[in-house]
C-alpha cells in the first residue's frame, strides 16, 4: 500500500482498522460488500466523468492494444457491474466497497485508499438524506469530530441557468467552470476564452428566431415548426421521429445568441458564490436572488425536500453549509452533491464526498435510466483525523515469538511454531538458525518480545527481550 508521505506501519494499521469498522457500519445499514476490478478500459471513466478526471488518470495501452486505466474512482466500476448483470437483487440495491484508487495529485501519493457506498434504484430525497447522513455518522462512530458538510445541487443550478435562457450545453459548461469564478478576474477571463473557443458566445444567424422560441412554451414551438414544415419532412426521417428531429433543431437554435444570456448567467453564479452559509440563512438569500432574476421559487423544491428528509437524522453536531456554487470534480453528478471538510485538512483535500448521478447507468449501457446516489471517503485522510485516544485494536494483540533452533532440530522448531499459532500466538521461525546474540538482535528489530530456542529433544528454552 502506497500511503501519504511519512507513512508508517502504524498508519497502515490505522487505515486497515478503520476500513474494517466502517465496513461493518455500512453493512449494518444494509450495504453489501462488493469488489471491483482495479484495472478497467479507459473509456469507462471518460464517458461521463469529464476532462478534469481524465487529466489525473494513470492510463496505458495493454498488450492487446486496448487503452486501460487504473481505477480513479469506484462508482463507474460499480455501475458497469450492475449494467452487466453481476449485481443481482431487487431495487433498491445497496453496495459498499473499499480498496485503492489512483489519481495524480501533485505533492501527494498517486494511490490512496477509499471506502464508500452506492445506493442504486432510489431517487427520493430520503435516499439522498440516507447517504449524506451515513457518510457523516460513519466518521462520528470512530470518534472524528469537527467536520462539516458542504451541500450543493447540480440539478437546481442547471435549472436556474435554463430559466435565464442559457442552452443546456452552455449551462453544463458554466457548471463545470464555477470554481474558476472564485479566482477573480483571471478566472473570468479564462472562462470567457474557453466559452468563445467552444462557440458558446457567437451571435449566430438565427438569433431573433432563437429569442422568440425561448420565450414560447416548448409544445407551442413544436407545433409552430411542424406547421412551417408540413409534409416536407416525410421520407427524410431515417430512424428518427419528426419530434426528435425538431427537438434537436431547437436545441441547436437555442445555442445561438447565447452571448446576451451568458453575461447574466455569469453574474448569477458570482452571486451564488457569496450566498453560501447555514441552510436556513442561505435559503432565504436564494429566494431574494431568484426574485431578482425572475426565477420561479419552486426551482428550489428539491433542496427543501432534501433538508426536510435530512432532519430525520441526528445531525445537530455537524455544521451544514448550503453552497450552490460548489462543484465536485466529476461531471456525472445530476442532483445533490456534498463534500465533507475539516479545518485540519489542507484546502483541496476533503475527507470525502459524493452525490446523485441519475444519468450514469444509462450512459454506461443500461437499458433505461436509473436513479443512483453514492459517496466515498479517503481513508488516509480519515486516519489523520482520529482522536489521540483512538483504540486501534478491537482485540488484544497476541504476543510475538521467534522460534529458533539448530539446523538439525528444524523439525522440532516447526512443530513448536505450529502449536503456538494454533493457540493464537504470532510465531515466526528463524530460518537461518542464528546464535543467541544474532537472534536477540533480530528479535528487537522485529519488535518480537520472546525467543524460544528448541533443542533436538523438543525441550524449549525461553528468552525474554
Residue spans of the language-model regions?
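Auxiliary tRNA-acceptor-end handling modules of aminoacyl-tRNA synthetases
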Residues: 1-12, 188-191, 200
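Glycine-/proline-rich flexible loop or hinge segments
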Residues: 2-9, 54-67, 115-118
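Positively charged, Gly/Ser-enriched RNA/tRNA-binding surfaces
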Residues: 11-29, 40-41, 75-87, 94-145, ...
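A short beta-strand-loop structural module common to alpha/beta enzyme folds
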Residues: 32-38
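Acidic, His- and aromatic-enriched active-site or binding-groove loops in soluble protein domains
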Residues: 56-64, 165-197, 342-344
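Short coil/turn segments at secondary-structure boundaries
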Residues: 91-97, 172-175, 189-193, 321-324
Amino acid at each position: 500500500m502506497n500511503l501519504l508521505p511519512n507513512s508508517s506501519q502504524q498508519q497502515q494499521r490505522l487505515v486497515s482498522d478503520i476500513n474494517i469498522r466502517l465496513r461493518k457500519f455500512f453493512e449494518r445499514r444494509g450495504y453489501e460488500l462488493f469488489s471491483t476490478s482495479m484495472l478497467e478500459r479507459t473509456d469507462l471513466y471518460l464517458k461521463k466523468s469529464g476532462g478534469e478526471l481524465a487529466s489525473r488518470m494513470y492510463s496505458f495501452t495493454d498488450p492487446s492494444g486496448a487503452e486501460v486505466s487504473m481505477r480513479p474512482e469506484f462508482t463507474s466500476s460499480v455501475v458497469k457491474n450492475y449494467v452487466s448483470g453481476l449485481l443481482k437483487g431487487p431495487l433498491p440495491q445497496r453496495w459498499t466497497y473499499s480498496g485503492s484508487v489512483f489519481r495524480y495529485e501533485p505533492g501527494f501519493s498517486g494511490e490512496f485508499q477509499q471506502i464508500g457506498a452506492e445506493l442504486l434504484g432510489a431517487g427520493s430525497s430520503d435516499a439522498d438524506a440516507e447517504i449524506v447522513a451515513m457518510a457523516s455518522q460513519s466518521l462520528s462512530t470512530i470518534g472524528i469530530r469537527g467536520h462539516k458538510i458542504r451541500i450543493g445541487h447540480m440539478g437546481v443550478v442547471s435549472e436556474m441557468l435554463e430559466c435565464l435562457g442559457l442552452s443546456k450545453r452552455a449551462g453544463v459548461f458554466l457548471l463545470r467552470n464555477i470554481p474558476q469564478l472564485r479566482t477573480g478576474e483571471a478566472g473570468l477571463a479564462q472562462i470567457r476564452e474557453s466559452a468563445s473557443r467552444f462557440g458558446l458566445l457567437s451571435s449566430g444567424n438565427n438569433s431573433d428566431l432563437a429569442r422568440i422560441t425561448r420565450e414560447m412554451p416548448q409544445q407551442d414551438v413544436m407545433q409552430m415548426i411542424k406547421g412551417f414544415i408540413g409534409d416536407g419532412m416525410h421520407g427524410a426521417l431515417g430512424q428518427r421521429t419528426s419530434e426528435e428531429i425538431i427537438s434537436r433543431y431547437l436545441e441547436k437554435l437555442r445555442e445561438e445568441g447565447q452571448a446576451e444570456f451568458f453575461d447574466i448567467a455569469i453574474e448569477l453564479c458570482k452571486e451564488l458564490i457569496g450566498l453560501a452559509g447555514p441552510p436556513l440563512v442561505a435559503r432565504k438569500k436564494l429566494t431574494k436572488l431568484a426574485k431578482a432574476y425572475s426565477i420561479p421559487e419552486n426551482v428550489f423544491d428539491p433542496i427543501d425536500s432534501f433538508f426536510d428528509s435530512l432532519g430525520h437524522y441526528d445531525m445537530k453536531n455537524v455544521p451544514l453549509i448550503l453552497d450552490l456554487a460548489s462543484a465536485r470534480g466529476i461531471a456525472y453528478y445530476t442532483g445533490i452533491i456534498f463534500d465533507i471538510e475539516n479545518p485540519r485538512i489542507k484546502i483541496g483535500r476533503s475527507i470525502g464526498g459524493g452525490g446523485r448521478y441519475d444519468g450514469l447507468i444509462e450512459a454506461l449501457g443500461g437499458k433505461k435510466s436509473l436513479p443512483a446516489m453514492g459517496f466515498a471517503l479517503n481513508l488516509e485522510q480519515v486516519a489523520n483525523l482520529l482522536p489521540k485516544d483512538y483504540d486501534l485494536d478491537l482485540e488484544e494483540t497476541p504476543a510475538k515469538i521467534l522460534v529458533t533452533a539448530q539446523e538439525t532440530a528444524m523439525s522440532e522448531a516447526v512443530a513448536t511454531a505450529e502449536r503456538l499459532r494454533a493457540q493464537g500466538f504470532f510465531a515466526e521461525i528463524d530460518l537461518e538458525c542464528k546464535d543467541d546474540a544474532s537472534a536477540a538482535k533480530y528479535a528487537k528489530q522485529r519488535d518480537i518480545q520472546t525467543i524460544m530456542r528448541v533443542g533436538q529433544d523438543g525441550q524449549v528454552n525461553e528468552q525474554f527481550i
